[in-house]
Swiss-Prot record:
Function: Binds to the 23S rRNA.
Annotated keywords: Ribonucleoprotein, Ribosomal protein, RNA-binding, rRNA-binding
GO biological process: translation
Gene: rplI
Family per similarity comment: Belongs to the bacterial ribosomal protein bL9 family.
Protein name: Large ribosomal subunit protein bL9
Domain of life of the organism encoding this protein: Bacteria
InterPro entries: Ribosomal_bL9, Ribosomal_bL9/RNase_H1_N, Ribosomal_bL9_bac/chp, Ribosomal_bL9_C, Ribosomal_bL9_C_sf, Ribosomal_bL9_N, Ribosomal_bL9_N_sf
Annotated organism of origin: Mesomycoplasma hyopneumoniae (strain 232) (Mycoplasma hyopneumoniae)
Amino acid sequence: MKVILIKDTKDGKANTIIDVSPGYATNFLFKNKLAEPLNSRTEKLLVKRKQQIEIEKQEKQEQIAKLKIEIERLVLWFKLKGNKESVHGAITAKKIKKELEIKGIFVDKQAIQTSGISTFGTSFVDIKLSSQTIAKLKINITKDE
């Protein structure tokens, strides 16, 4: 019996067609609302669902690309106390996130890949926006008098 999976299961991912025994389909998949039987109506719905998922995926990629451009144009300025050779403190992911939010950019703290910047001058921080997209944020640290 051919069925369309509604949710991810051990048999496959959501929105895929699989072939299972009628007993398994009736007693487990349909009962737990994990799948629906394959017929012309559900097949048309599956095609529409896949198209909608593809459109949403492309829109998300476009948003990520715009966000990457916006982040890479930005320069954040921080002040740290210290003398000529040593710095007192560090710029952490939490501080970077807070400054980005002030500028209207919202990213997850775990996306900011830094272990703390503790040197004066210009540094670059990677911000992981998706599995394939990483933006480089420019950070300038000056001495606080």
